[in-house]
């Protein structure tokens, strides 16, 4: 019997800059085993032992928050306000173990019962018929992750995922069934692969989110192994916080080029280039169906792009969203962390232009 995943539903620590951070993960651990996965590669934050969410407990939280009006903690306050959920923030909801446990299926059943909006992130290329019976384009959207187009390139970085052509075919099927669909091109490593992917998929998607490769500063073994695979990449990685990243000039040039080759809206997942996005959230949640309207707008990206600080933000204590060493003494609310992150990112809490500092 699998261990129970104790914390399957909670806003992530990315909420200061992300409006689609109320994540649900039905599994802890992922069989797709992508070499670049931040969840597996960052030290200390993601255990590798397999665990399954207690879906009955999640159902209880939904009932208490939505039917009984319980807003006693951050997750229940978000549920009560129908903040859209991002399913698959750390592990794929449709990996192989779903055939045995059906935790994602049961979670989507809850979503359908409460007509609750869920954005599904996945690398899958197929769903059994039982899923189509509960999925609803009004409340369910899909973000498919694909890093490139050619089989050899994909297999260099991903050993157990469907090929890009299979995932693109799945995107086409989703569009034909009426779903909002995006492709998250992450990580960007070789631009020629990005261009091939866009040309093969742009007729089937509503949005692209793009984000460049990041390597963990605190995991030398992973860095060494992945750097050996980066043949043909003409850029210098620079240290920024906990990660090595592409330099900002290269990232900006890449984004400008991507925008020049497609008419599909682009969202920029790199934290330093959020404002180059074609929408107010890098994953495009503001372009999803109206059921998603209550996304968490009080974040640094939204404020930077609109100047609007009047949007609702949860009042419950949010410190459970962080590891202990990231909690700031005296802070309890999301808005406090957002305001601090905004000032740190842009230098002045009242600076509202779209200039990149």
Give the predicted meaning of each segment.
Residues 1-3, 7-16, 26, 33-36, ...:
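Intrinsic structural disorder
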Residues 2-3, 200-357:
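Auxiliary Fe-S-binding modules of radical SAM enzymes
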Residues 2-143, 149-151, 339, 343, ...:
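Conserved Radical SAM active-site core
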Residues 68-257:
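Conserved AdoMet/S-adenosylmethionine-binding subsite of the radical SAM
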């Amino acid at each position: 019997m699998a261990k129970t995943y104790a914390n399957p539903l909670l806003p992530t620590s990315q909420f200061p800059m992300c409006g689609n951070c109320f994540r649900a993960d039905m599994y802890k651990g992922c069989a797709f085993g992508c070499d670049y996965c931040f969840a597996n590669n960052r030290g200390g934050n993601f255990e590798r032992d397999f665990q399954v969410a207690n879906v009955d407990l999640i159902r209880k939280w939904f009932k208490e928050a939505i039917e009984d009006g319980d807003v006693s903690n951050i997750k229940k306050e978000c549920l009560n306000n129908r903040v859209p959920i991002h399913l698959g923030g750390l592990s794929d909801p449709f990996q192989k173990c779903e055939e045995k446990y059906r935790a994602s299926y049961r979670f989507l059943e809850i979503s359908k019962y409460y007509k609750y909006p869920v954005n599904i992130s996945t690398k899958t290329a197929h769903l059994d018929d039982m899923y189509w019976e509960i999925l609803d384009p009004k409340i369910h959207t899909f973000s498919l992750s694909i890093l490139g187009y050619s089989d050899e390139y994909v297999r260099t970085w991903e050993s157990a995922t469907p090929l890009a052509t299979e995932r693109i075919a799945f995107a086409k099927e989703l569009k034909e069934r009426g779903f909002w669909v995006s492709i998250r091109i992450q990580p960007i490593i070789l631009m020629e692969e990005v261009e091939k992917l866009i040309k093969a998929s742009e007729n089937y998607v509503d949005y692209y989110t793009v984000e460049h490769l990041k390597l963990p500063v605190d995991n030398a073994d992973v860095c060494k192994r992945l750097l050996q695979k980066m043949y043909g990449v003409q850029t210098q990685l620079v240290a920024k916080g906990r990660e090595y990243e592409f330099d900002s000039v290269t990232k900006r040039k890449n984004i400008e080029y991507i925008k020049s080759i497609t008419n599909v809206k682009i969202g920029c997942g790199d934290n330093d280039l959020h404002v180059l996005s074609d929408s107010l959230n890098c994953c495009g949640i503001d372009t999803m169906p109206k059921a998603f309207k209550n996304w968490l707008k009080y974040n640094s990206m939204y404020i930077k792009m609109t100047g609007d600080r009047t949007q609702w933000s949860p009042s419950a204590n949010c410190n459970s969203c962080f590891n202990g060493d990231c909690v700031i003494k005296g802070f309890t609310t999301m808005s406090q962390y957002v305001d601090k992150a905004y000032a740190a990112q842009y230098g002045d809490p009242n600076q509202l232009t779209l200039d990149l500092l």
